[in-house]
Amino acid sequence: MAKKGKKIVAAQQKVDADRKYDISEGIDTALQARFAGFDESVDIAVRLGVDPRHADQMVRGSVVLPHGTGKEIKILVFAKGEKEKEALDAGADFVGNDELIEDIKNGWFGFDKAVATPDMMGAVGKIGKLLGPRGLMPNAKTGTVTFDVARAVNDLKAGKIDFRVDKAGIVHAPLGKASFGTEKLQDNMLALLRMLVAMKPATSKGAYMRSLAVSTSMGAGVRLDPLLVKDAVK
């Protein structure tokens, strides 16, 4: 087994694996435990008390992070007529209809998010097998199938993220960049957690937020105290 580098060991020693932190101290600890030489992303994993095998316990949605994600994204909008101009005026990077669909069929995926007007979904659905696995399929539940394309583009540019519980009942989401600092990352985390609480399924029993961990891209996971988090999101 390969030995861990000194930087990795030193970083891991800054995290008390037996402790559960409050939000602010947890984020601060994760930032202190960095060792990579770049501005790492900061992410959170939240294990929910849901069984995603049941449709009524599938937690899926979106939220606009108040300080954004720190990542510049390219947005594609499937639209026709006046909605094309509306999307361009809002700052969309690629706007069109049939020609964009053909480009995607030919293997082009030079965008990070896709929005579609409802009248385009019949055509867009035909490339669903190409978009879906890449997380690029527009979806009404996340606000990316809409005639209000300007708002959809503005929200995405402002830092809107999508989240979805996985098969293990865990939601993984980005909170921003390490350079944001503890305060901004905490604001972003609270926005996400409050949305998760608001979306709690009526059929979910017992504790809802079972466990939480925050980490940088390369750093060690820092566990948060679910009870302290629950108090913070009220």
From Swiss-Prot:
Protein family membership: Belongs to the universal ribosomal protein uL1 family.
Pfam families in the cross-refs: Ribosomal_L1 (PF00687)
Keyword Ribonucleoprotein: yes
UniProt GO cellular component terms: cytosolic large ribosomal subunit
Keyword Chloroplast applies: no
Subunit structure, interactors included: Part of the 50S ribosomal subunit.
SUPFAM superfamilies: Ribosomal protein L1 (SSF56808)
Alphabetized GO MF terms: rRNA binding; structural constituent of ribosome; tRNA binding
BP terms from Gene Ontology: regulation of translation; translation
Gene giving rise to this polypeptide: rplA
Record function comment: Binds directly to 23S rRNA. The L1 stalk is quite mobile in the ribosome, and is involved in E site tRNA release. Protein L1 is also a translational repressor protein, it controls the translation of the L11 operon by binding to its mRNA.
Record organism: Desulfosudis oleivorans (strain DSM 6200 / JCM 39069 / Hxd3)
Keywords assigned by UniProt, alphabetized: Repressor, Ribonucleoprotein, Ribosomal protein, RNA-binding, rRNA-binding, Translation regulation, tRNA-binding
CDD domains cross-referenced by the UniProt entry: Ribosomal_L1 (cd00403)
Name listed for the protein in its UniProt record: Large ribosomal subunit protein uL1
Domain of life: Bacteria
